[in-house]
Regions:
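Extreme N-terminal, non-catalytic leader segments
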Residues: 1-40, 44-61, 68, 94-98
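C-terminal lobe/tail of nucleotide-utilizing enzymes
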Residues: 1-26, 197-300
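Nucleotide-state-sensitive switch-loop elements of NTP-binding domains
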Residues: 18, 28-32, 55-59, 65-153, ...
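Residue-level signature of catalytic and energy-coupling elements of molecular machines
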Residues: 38, 113, 132, 152, ...
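Conserved catalytic-core segment of NTP-binding enzymes
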Residues: 55, 138-148, 153-238, 243-244
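Helical mechanochemical/support elements of P-loop NTPase systems and associated helical scaffolds
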Residues: 67, 125-128, 132, 158, ...
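A short beta-loop-alpha structural element at the N-terminal edge
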Residues: 301-314
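Conserved GNAT-fold acetyl-CoA-binding loop/helix
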Residues: 320-327
Length: 327
Protein backbone atom coordinates (compact mmCIF):
# COMPACT_ATOMS: atom_id res chain seq x y z
CA UNK A 1 0.00 0.00 0.00
CA UNK A 2 1.32 3.46 -0.89
CA UNK A 3 2.26 5.81 1.96
CA UNK A 4 0.16 8.40 0.16
CA UNK A 5 -2.97 6.25 0.17
CA UNK A 6 -5.92 8.50 1.20
CA UNK A 7 -7.15 5.93 3.69
CA UNK A 8 -3.76 5.79 5.41
CA UNK A 9 -3.51 9.58 5.57
CA UNK A 10 -7.02 9.89 6.99
CA UNK A 11 -6.22 7.25 9.61
CA UNK A 12 -3.04 9.11 10.65
CA UNK A 13 -4.89 12.43 10.80
CA UNK A 14 -7.63 10.96 13.01
CA UNK A 15 -5.22 10.27 15.88
CA UNK A 16 -5.12 13.07 18.45
CA UNK A 17 -1.48 14.25 18.82
CA UNK A 18 0.24 15.02 22.09
CA UNK A 19 -0.56 18.46 23.55
CA UNK A 20 1.62 21.36 22.45
CA UNK A 21 4.35 21.96 25.06
CA UNK A 22 3.39 25.00 27.13
CA UNK A 23 6.54 25.35 29.21
CA UNK A 24 9.47 27.62 28.35
CA UNK A 25 11.45 26.81 25.20
CA UNK A 26 14.66 25.14 26.34
CA UNK A 27 16.50 24.54 23.05
CA UNK A 28 19.69 26.59 22.88
CA UNK A 29 18.70 28.36 19.65
CA UNK A 30 15.13 29.58 19.30
CA UNK A 31 14.06 29.48 15.65
CA UNK A 32 10.94 31.59 15.22
CA UNK A 33 8.92 31.97 12.01
CA UNK A 34 7.02 35.23 11.64
CA UNK A 35 4.07 35.34 9.21
CA UNK A 36 1.80 38.12 8.07
CA UNK A 37 0.05 39.72 5.15
CA UNK A 38 2.21 41.71 2.76
CA UNK A 39 2.32 45.27 4.04
CA UNK A 40 1.35 44.30 7.59
CA UNK A 41 4.68 45.49 8.95
CA UNK A 42 6.57 42.21 9.42
CA UNK A 43 9.86 43.55 8.13
CA UNK A 44 9.52 46.77 10.14
CA UNK A 45 8.78 44.86 13.35
CA UNK A 46 11.52 42.28 12.79
CA UNK A 47 14.24 44.78 11.91
CA UNK A 48 13.57 46.70 15.12
CA UNK A 49 13.06 43.56 17.21
CA UNK A 50 16.31 41.98 16.02
CA UNK A 51 18.18 45.25 16.63
CA UNK A 52 16.85 45.54 20.19
CA UNK A 53 17.70 41.90 20.93
CA UNK A 54 21.26 42.45 19.72
CA UNK A 55 21.62 45.52 21.94
CA UNK A 56 20.51 43.35 24.86
CA UNK A 57 23.48 41.07 24.21
CA UNK A 58 21.74 38.35 22.19
CA UNK A 59 23.16 36.79 19.05
CA UNK A 60 20.48 37.24 16.39
CA UNK A 61 20.18 36.06 12.80
CA UNK A 62 17.42 37.57 10.66
CA UNK A 63 16.52 35.69 7.47
CA UNK A 64 14.19 37.17 4.88
CA UNK A 65 12.07 34.41 3.32
CA UNK A 66 9.95 36.65 1.11
CA UNK A 67 10.54 36.78 -2.68
CA UNK A 68 10.37 40.60 -2.44
CA UNK A 69 13.68 40.39 -0.56
CA UNK A 70 12.95 43.51 1.49
CA UNK A 71 13.24 42.13 5.03
CA UNK A 72 16.73 43.52 5.63
CA UNK A 73 16.30 46.85 3.82
CA UNK A 74 15.31 48.80 6.94
CA UNK A 75 18.13 47.25 8.94
CA UNK A 76 20.70 48.32 6.33
CA UNK A 77 19.39 51.82 5.69
CA UNK A 78 17.50 50.97 2.52
CA UNK A 79 20.34 49.06 0.87
CA UNK A 80 19.47 45.73 -0.72
CA UNK A 81 21.64 42.68 -0.10
CA UNK A 82 22.57 39.92 -2.57
CA UNK A 83 20.12 37.07 -2.14
CA UNK A 84 21.14 33.48 -1.54
CA UNK A 85 19.28 32.18 -4.59
CA UNK A 86 20.67 34.82 -6.96
CA UNK A 87 24.21 34.50 -5.62
CA UNK A 88 24.09 30.72 -5.68
CA UNK A 89 23.05 30.74 -9.36
CA UNK A 90 25.82 33.18 -10.32
CA UNK A 91 28.46 31.22 -8.43
CA UNK A 92 27.33 27.97 -10.00
CA UNK A 93 27.59 29.43 -13.51
CA UNK A 94 31.09 30.68 -12.69
CA UNK A 95 32.10 27.28 -11.30
CA UNK A 96 32.63 28.73 -7.82
CA UNK A 97 31.42 27.81 -4.35
CA UNK A 98 29.15 30.18 -2.45
CA UNK A 99 30.50 31.44 0.87
CA UNK A 100 28.76 32.93 3.88
CA UNK A 101 30.55 36.23 3.26
CA UNK A 102 28.73 36.47 -0.09
CA UNK A 103 25.24 36.54 1.41
CA UNK A 104 25.32 37.40 5.13
CA UNK A 105 25.87 40.92 6.42
CA UNK A 106 25.80 42.53 9.85
CA UNK A 107 24.95 45.74 11.66
CA UNK A 108 25.54 46.45 15.33
CA UNK A 109 25.42 42.78 16.26
CA UNK A 110 22.53 41.72 14.00
CA UNK A 111 23.35 39.22 11.25
CA UNK A 112 20.98 39.24 8.30
CA UNK A 113 20.45 37.67 4.89
CA UNK A 114 17.80 37.23 2.20
CA UNK A 115 16.81 33.91 0.63
CA UNK A 116 15.29 35.68 -2.37
CA UNK A 117 13.17 34.11 -5.07
CA UNK A 118 12.67 33.84 -8.84
CA UNK A 119 11.76 36.79 -11.01
CA UNK A 120 8.07 37.34 -11.66
CA UNK A 121 6.67 34.66 -13.96
CA UNK A 122 9.94 32.72 -14.06
CA UNK A 123 9.62 30.14 -11.35
CA UNK A 124 8.07 28.93 -8.12
CA UNK A 125 8.57 31.13 -5.06
CA UNK A 126 7.98 28.24 -2.68
CA UNK A 127 10.53 26.08 -4.46
CA UNK A 128 12.94 28.99 -4.18
CA UNK A 129 12.48 28.97 -0.40
CA UNK A 130 13.23 25.25 -0.26
CA UNK A 131 16.35 25.72 -2.41
CA UNK A 132 17.43 28.59 -0.18
CA UNK A 133 17.24 26.46 2.96
CA UNK A 134 19.13 23.65 1.24
CA UNK A 135 21.91 26.14 0.51
CA UNK A 136 21.86 27.35 4.13
CA UNK A 137 22.38 23.78 5.31
CA UNK A 138 25.41 23.45 3.03
CA UNK A 139 26.77 26.67 4.55
CA UNK A 140 26.52 25.14 8.02
CA UNK A 141 23.19 26.49 9.29
CA UNK A 142 22.84 23.82 11.98
CA UNK A 143 26.32 24.54 13.34
CA UNK A 144 25.92 28.29 13.80
CA UNK A 145 25.74 29.69 17.32
CA UNK A 146 22.80 32.08 17.62
CA UNK A 147 20.38 32.71 20.44
CA UNK A 148 17.58 33.58 18.01
CA UNK A 149 16.96 32.92 14.33
CA UNK A 150 14.04 34.99 13.04
CA UNK A 151 12.43 33.90 9.75
CA UNK A 152 10.33 36.50 7.92
CA UNK A 153 7.68 34.72 5.83
CA UNK A 154 4.98 35.99 3.51
CA UNK A 155 1.63 34.82 4.85
CA UNK A 156 -0.63 35.59 1.88
CA UNK A 157 0.57 32.62 -0.17
CA UNK A 158 -0.76 29.12 0.53
CA UNK A 159 2.13 27.42 -1.33
CA UNK A 160 3.70 24.66 0.74
CA UNK A 161 7.19 26.10 0.37
CA UNK A 162 6.25 29.06 2.51
CA UNK A 163 4.83 26.71 5.13
CA UNK A 164 8.09 24.76 5.35
CA UNK A 165 8.99 25.73 8.96
CA UNK A 166 5.55 24.63 10.16
CA UNK A 167 5.32 21.48 8.04
CA UNK A 168 8.81 20.21 8.89
CA UNK A 169 9.11 21.44 12.48
CA UNK A 170 12.00 23.68 11.46
CA UNK A 171 10.98 26.26 14.06
CA UNK A 172 9.79 25.96 17.64
CA UNK A 173 7.10 28.58 17.37
CA UNK A 174 5.26 30.92 15.03
CA UNK A 175 4.35 34.58 15.50
CA UNK A 176 1.74 36.37 13.37
CA UNK A 177 1.75 40.08 12.53
CA UNK A 178 -1.61 41.78 11.96
CA UNK A 179 -3.59 45.01 12.31
CA UNK A 180 -7.23 45.86 13.00
CA UNK A 181 -8.29 45.03 9.45
CA UNK A 182 -10.04 42.02 7.98
CA UNK A 183 -7.40 41.08 5.40
CA UNK A 184 -4.45 40.92 7.79
CA UNK A 185 -6.52 38.96 10.32
CA UNK A 186 -7.68 36.63 7.54
CA UNK A 187 -4.03 35.81 6.83
CA UNK A 188 -3.26 35.41 10.55
CA UNK A 189 -6.21 33.02 10.86
CA UNK A 190 -4.95 31.00 7.88
CA UNK A 191 -1.55 30.67 9.53
CA UNK A 192 -3.29 29.39 12.67
CA UNK A 193 -5.17 26.90 10.47
CA UNK A 194 -1.88 25.67 9.00
CA UNK A 195 -0.40 25.20 12.47
CA UNK A 196 -3.48 23.28 13.60
CA UNK A 197 -3.45 21.11 10.46
CA UNK A 198 0.15 20.04 10.93
CA UNK A 199 -0.45 19.46 14.63
CA UNK A 200 -3.08 16.92 13.62
CA UNK A 201 -0.49 15.35 11.30
CA UNK A 202 1.95 14.95 14.20
CA UNK A 203 3.78 18.29 14.11
CA UNK A 204 4.96 20.18 17.17
CA UNK A 205 4.99 23.85 16.15
CA UNK A 206 2.72 26.22 18.08
CA UNK A 207 1.75 29.89 17.84
CA UNK A 208 3.48 32.06 20.45
CA UNK A 209 1.34 35.11 19.83
CA UNK A 210 0.59 38.12 17.67
CA UNK A 211 2.38 41.41 17.06
CA UNK A 212 -0.33 44.03 16.66
CA UNK A 213 0.99 46.67 14.26
CA UNK A 214 -0.58 50.03 13.34
CA UNK A 215 -2.95 49.73 16.30
CA UNK A 216 -5.69 52.35 15.96
CA UNK A 217 -7.51 51.20 19.07
CA UNK A 218 -10.58 49.71 17.36
CA UNK A 219 -10.00 46.33 19.04
CA UNK A 220 -10.60 43.77 16.28
CA UNK A 221 -7.09 42.28 16.46
CA UNK A 222 -7.29 41.91 20.24
CA UNK A 223 -10.67 40.20 19.86
CA UNK A 224 -9.19 37.86 17.26
CA UNK A 225 -6.25 36.94 19.49
CA UNK A 226 -8.58 36.19 22.38
CA UNK A 227 -10.88 34.12 20.16
CA UNK A 228 -8.11 31.90 18.76
CA UNK A 229 -6.33 31.63 22.11
CA UNK A 230 -3.04 33.46 21.57
CA UNK A 231 -1.58 36.49 23.40
CA UNK A 232 -0.80 39.91 21.94
CA UNK A 233 2.97 40.19 22.37
CA UNK A 234 3.13 43.89 21.63
CA UNK A 235 0.84 46.63 20.29
CA UNK A 236 2.67 49.11 18.05
CA UNK A 237 0.50 52.22 17.66
CA UNK A 238 -0.58 53.78 14.38
CA UNK A 239 1.72 56.77 14.80
CA UNK A 240 2.92 59.31 12.24
CA UNK A 241 6.43 59.48 13.71
CA UNK A 242 6.80 55.69 13.45
CA UNK A 243 5.46 55.73 9.89
CA UNK A 244 7.89 58.42 8.75
CA UNK A 245 10.92 56.83 10.35
CA UNK A 246 10.04 53.44 8.90
CA UNK A 247 9.60 54.97 5.43
CA UNK A 248 13.04 56.58 5.80
CA UNK A 249 14.68 53.30 6.86
CA UNK A 250 15.39 54.47 10.41
CA UNK A 251 15.65 51.98 13.27
CA UNK A 252 13.43 52.98 16.20
CA UNK A 253 14.15 49.89 18.32
CA UNK A 254 17.24 51.45 19.93
CA UNK A 255 17.64 51.44 23.73
CA UNK A 256 17.75 55.26 23.87
CA UNK A 257 14.89 55.95 21.46
CA UNK A 258 11.38 57.25 22.15
CA UNK A 259 9.98 53.82 21.27
CA UNK A 260 12.54 51.69 23.13
CA UNK A 261 10.04 50.37 25.69
CA UNK A 262 7.85 48.91 22.92
CA UNK A 263 10.61 46.74 21.55
CA UNK A 264 12.05 45.89 24.96
CA UNK A 265 8.61 44.50 25.82
CA UNK A 266 8.41 42.69 22.49
CA UNK A 267 11.89 41.17 22.86
CA UNK A 268 11.02 39.86 26.33
CA UNK A 269 7.67 38.44 25.25
CA UNK A 270 9.04 36.82 22.09
CA UNK A 271 11.74 35.11 24.15
CA UNK A 272 9.43 33.82 26.87
CA UNK A 273 6.11 33.16 25.10
CA UNK A 274 5.40 29.41 24.90
CA UNK A 275 4.09 27.81 21.69
CA UNK A 276 0.32 27.39 21.93
CA UNK A 277 -2.20 25.39 19.94
CA UNK A 278 -4.61 27.93 18.42
CA UNK A 279 -8.31 27.50 17.71
CA UNK A 280 -8.77 29.00 14.22
CA UNK A 281 -12.02 30.74 13.33
CA UNK A 282 -14.32 29.89 10.44
CA UNK A 283 -15.21 32.60 7.95
CA UNK A 284 -18.32 33.69 9.84
CA UNK A 285 -16.41 33.84 13.10
CA UNK A 286 -13.81 36.07 11.49
CA UNK A 287 -16.43 38.38 9.98
CA UNK A 288 -18.24 38.62 13.30
CA UNK A 289 -15.21 40.39 14.78
CA UNK A 290 -16.21 43.39 12.67
CA UNK A 291 -19.36 45.45 12.39
CA UNK A 292 -21.70 44.18 9.66
CA UNK A 293 -21.68 47.73 8.26
CA UNK A 294 -17.99 47.29 7.50
CA UNK A 295 -17.95 43.74 6.15
CA UNK A 296 -21.43 43.24 4.72
CA UNK A 297 -21.74 40.17 6.94
CA UNK A 298 -25.49 40.68 7.27
CA UNK A 299 -26.04 39.74 3.61
CA UNK A 300 -27.98 36.55 2.93
CA UNK A 301 -26.91 34.41 -0.03
CA UNK A 302 -29.49 34.24 -2.83
CA UNK A 303 -29.00 31.27 -5.18
CA UNK A 304 -28.96 31.93 -8.93
CA UNK A 305 -31.43 30.16 -11.23
CA UNK A 306 -31.14 28.98 -14.83
CA UNK A 307 -33.39 31.88 -15.86
CA UNK A 308 -30.98 34.29 -14.14
CA UNK A 309 -28.04 32.79 -15.98
CA UNK A 310 -29.75 33.06 -19.39
CA UNK A 311 -31.23 36.48 -18.80
CA UNK A 312 -34.60 35.19 -20.03
CA UNK A 313 -37.42 32.86 -19.08
CA UNK A 314 -36.34 29.26 -18.74
CA UNK A 315 -38.55 26.21 -19.24
CA UNK A 316 -37.35 22.90 -17.85
CA UNK A 317 -37.07 20.36 -20.64
CA UNK A 318 -37.95 16.71 -20.10
CA UNK A 319 -34.94 14.50 -19.52
CA UNK A 320 -33.88 12.10 -22.29
CA UNK A 321 -32.41 9.74 -19.73
CA UNK A 322 -33.75 6.20 -20.06
CA UNK A 323 -34.90 4.83 -16.72
CA UNK A 324 -35.22 1.05 -16.57
CA UNK A 325 -37.56 -0.76 -14.24
CA UNK A 326 -35.87 -2.71 -11.49
CA UNK A 327 -35.55 -6.41 -12.30
Amino acid sequence: MSMFDPGVLREEASHEPDPVPTGPVTKETQIIAIYGKGGSGKSFALANLSYMMAQQGKRVLLIGCDPKSDTTSLLFGGKSTPTIIETSSKKKLAGEEIGIEDVCFQRDGVFAMELGGPEVGRGCGGRGIIHGFETLEKLGFHEWGFDYVLLDFLGDVVCGGFGLPIARDMCQKVIVVASNDLQSLYVANNVCKAVEYFRKMGGNVGVAGMILNKDDGTGEANAFAEAVGIPVLCAIPANEDIRKKSANYQIIGKPDSQWASLFEELAENVAEAPPLRPTPLDQDGLLNLFSADITGADYTLRPATQADMRGAEYVTKPSLEVVYDAV
